[in-house]
Amino acid sequence: MRVGQSFDIHRYSDDAERTLVLGGVRFDGHRGLAGHSDADVITHACIDALLSAAGLDDIGQMFSDTDPAWAGADSIKLLRRAVDALRAAGWDPVNVSCVAVLDSPKLAPQRELMRQRLSDAVGAPVTVSGRTTEGVGALGRGEGVAAMASALVVRNPHSSAFSDDAALAGQQDQRHT
């Protein structure tokens, strides 16, 4: 069992056509965030927490912001790819918890939809909560949105990714009998 943590932050975009996406949900009528993909800070934090827990490359290495293949990418699709990589490495997600820091928009009206979309992509429960800044700092001035996430993963006992570990454990067990 392993735990990963992450943090992501994006400034608001100057592009008036860009839509705010948080947790895989569009918030129409709100200024979007700047980024190479859809700039979904909640989903990005979840991705990085899962990758960290499994000891895999971080989101910037897996989905480079210099690679045109990821330009404008839907972050929920990136999350699914990250979970596929996690499972291929022999890990299964147990849960993810994410906290977004922003003053507007309020997440509560869309929280259940965000939770559902993220949980479906991860294949495990994902919780989302929001915190305000009370007007403090850059986020309080409306310069961007931040998110933090923690993820718990466990080894998949049926994965061949850990076959060397299992063989070694078996050898150690035989020496102690």
Residues of each region from the PLM?
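Glycine- and Gly-Pro-enriched alpha-helical subdomains that act as flexible
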Residues: 49-92, 103
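C-terminal edge-of-domain segments
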Residues: 140-159
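Short, conserved loop-to-beta-strand elements that form functional interface hotspots
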Residues: 95-140
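Active-site His/Glu-centered metal-binding helix of metallohydrolases
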Residues: 42, 46, 50
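Polyampholytic, low-complexity intrinsically disordered segments
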Residues: 10, 15, 19-28
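Short amphipathic
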Residues: 2-8
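A short glycine/serine-rich beta->alpha loop
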Residues: 27-37, 65-70, 135-139
